[in-house]
Amino acid sequence: MAPTELATLTSYPDAGYNHSGWLSDDGNTYAMQDENHGYDVKLLDVSDFNNISVISTFNSGMNAQCMAHNGIIKGDLLYLAYYHDGLRIFDISDPSTPTQVSSYDTYSPTSYNSYKGAWGVYPNLPSGNIIVSDMQSGLYILDCTNPINSIENINSN
C-alpha cells in the first residue's frame, strides 16, 4: 500500500533545502532546518494538517551566513547543531518567541561558506548529558543537567 499524503507546506520564508526537522512531544510544533547558509530555523504549527503555518523564524545571531543542522526537541528545548556556531539551545515553550538559553562552541569559524563544525546533537541520554559531533574537532559529551544556566564539557577527544 502506498503512503497517503495528508498535508504539504511548499511555500514559507527562506524556503531551501529542507534537510531535517523534529516534532514536539505534544505533536503541535515542528522545528525544521533548511540547510542553506543564512536561512533561519522555522517553527511550524502542525496541530491542524489543513492549516500548517510558520509560527516563527530565528537563527543563532552569530553571523548572517550561519546554518542550523539536525535539531531535536526535548520538552520545551530545541537543541541544534549549528555547524560553525556549535551547539545552540533554544527555549521554545512559547513557539512564537524562541529564546536562546545556552550554547557551546565546538569550532572556531574562519569562513561561513562551508560545512564545518557541529553536525549532530543528541540530548536524550538517561544521564541528561548531551552528545555533540563536530566534523573537524571530534565528539563532545556535555553536562547539560541545567541547560539554562550552563554547559560543562565533560570529555572531548
Feature roles, as predicted:
Residues 152-157:
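Surface-exposed, proline-anchored Ser/Thr-rich loop/turn motifs
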Residues 1-150:
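Feature marking well-ordered beta-strand scaffolds used for ligand recognition
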